[in-house]
């Protein structure tokens, strides 16, 4: 039997807590920073992978900027572009935060669907306000 997923369905991710994790070749996983950050409304941040890790074939993203006012651990999207598995050990430095001071305070600091996250959080795109507006128009 086939099933389909619409953007209104939440995907349940399997949580893995181990001292090491093997990312198979050409595979994607979600991870979480150890650090819990609280950004004031005049500082933004983004995450950059470390060069040594990138040279192993591990791509690290965090879906863009960490918004001013964000509080929580940052979810990372990790992709192994290598043809071999990559083993990551707990507490290994794989990325770094870059903090940017803004010229002024944010008009609307972050209070979104990921605020206060303490763990790896899957996509909550189904909670996007523009998606909800489109769904209501169709009804």
Predicted features by range, described:
Residues 1-139:
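DUTPase catalytic domain/fold
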């Amino acid at each position: 039997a086939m099933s389909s997923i619409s953007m209104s369905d939440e995907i349940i991710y399997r949580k893995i807590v181990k001292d090491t994790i093997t990312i198979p070749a050409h595979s994607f996983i979600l991870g979480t920073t150890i650090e819990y950050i609280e950004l004031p409304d005049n500082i933004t941040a983004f995450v950059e992978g470390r060069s040594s890790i990138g040279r192993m074939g591990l791509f690290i993203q965090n879906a863009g900027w960490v918004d001013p006012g964000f509080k929580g651990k940052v979810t990372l999207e990790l992709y192994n572009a290598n043809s071999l598995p990559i083993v990551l050990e707990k507490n290994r430095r794989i990325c770094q935060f870059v903090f940017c001071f803004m010229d002024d305070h944010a008009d609307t600091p972050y209070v979104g669907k990921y605020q206060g996250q303490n763990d790896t959080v899957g996509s909550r795109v189904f909670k996007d306000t523009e998606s909800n507006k489109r769904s209501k128009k169709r009804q």
